[in-house]
Amino acid sequence: MNSRTASARGWFSSRPPTSESDLEPATDGPASETTTLSPEATTFNDTRIPDAAGGTAGVGTMLLSFGIITVIGLAVALVLYIRKKKRLEKLRHQLMPMYNFDPTEEQDELEQELLEHGRDAASVQAATSVQAMQGKTTLPSQGPLQRPSRLVFTDVANAIHA
């Protein structure tokens, strides 16, 4: 049991185990004797101020570790950015698989169609006014043949307000 306590005490304490006889004051000699200790013997503090060369090495080590952490962080951010970009590209392809949209081309077609629609409406009005002057009336189904056009935003707005 004592060997277990001594070994446990050795693990948990940095001091060697002491017995009670070590704790009692020594009374071998006369009590009037004094011992003088030199300053070197009483100094237990072994801490020294680091020299300048050791300080720059510590700063270099700190900067190196900071640099490594920064590079790892940038690499992780780059990987996440690439994954996000691929995911958005995949989603875009899923949403419009067979459709290639070019807004400039679409705008040109829309403008051309609006111009043609305006000309068609003007020609219908002119034909109606000419027929009214001549005294002939036509039903809308007998009017000039118009080519079917796409539904445009103005047509939708006019239909809503009508």
UniProtKB/Swiss-Prot annotation:
Protein name: Uncharacterized protein C3orf18
GO cellular component terms listed in the entry, alphabetical order: membrane
Region span, Disordered: 1-49
Biased amino acid composition, Polar residues: 32-46
Broad class of where this protein is predominantly found: membrane
Disulfide feature: none
Topology with respect to the bilayer: Single-pass membrane protein
Subcellular location: Membrane
The keyword Secreted is assigned to this record: no
The keyword Glycosyltransferase is assigned to this record: no
Gene that this polypeptide is encoded by: C3orf18
